[in-house]
Amino acid sequence: MTPRPAVSAHRGGSERAGPATWEAYEDAIASGAEYVEFDIRRTGDGVLVVYHDPRVGPAGPPLARVTHAELCDRAGYAVPVVDDVMALIAGKLVAHLDLKEIGYEREVIDRAVALLGADGLVVTTLEDCSVAAVTRGFPEVRTALSLGRDRRELALARLPGTRLSELFPARRIRACGAHGVAVHQRLARTNVLREATRRGLFTMVWTVNDDSLMRSFLTHPRVDVLVTDRPRRAVALRGPITRPRH
């Protein structure tokens, strides 16, 4: 029987609430997803928050220069605190922690393990050094190296080398000690999934919202977790999990 991957609600999902809001994370619990993803950054007053972008708006100040209260005011909603979201989902969903910055790995994972247990989370990040910090400090916690960095974050001269290292990431994975890969859907259509499973790594594919692509990845034998903004739809398309993946 074909195994079916788990579903991760990206930013809590956005089918019934704004993404990365408290309401989205409450809704994720009822969505049928097994995982829920949240991005982690730190504000200027040291609060670890669930927020994707490095700035408050396209031309706004960096998060590192505003307090949590200022961030909420500028964003126009109560930006969730990481500890609160972890407490909300504890025992209900696996936390998919996407680390957006370096330097706070131990603090975040200490809290996560205390609230969720080591088997209640998976850590993803684009930064090899963050993966290495987590795998060294918390070998019992699953980590996945994210592949598919936004080209807008890269100088033109770095783009070819970065893409090559994502298409053939074995050296990076060995160096940082990742247990898996979190692959952008475009890269997932290359050889990356095949190589990952050949090496015994678990795999996540992000962020898949189109019905036809979801169907394709939900029946893909090399996909362990599908990350989507539409967790209810993904669960409906998938049907029940037929065999535990990891």
Predicted regions and their residues:
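Phosphate-group recognition and catalysis centered on beta-loop-alpha active-site segments
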Residues: 1-246
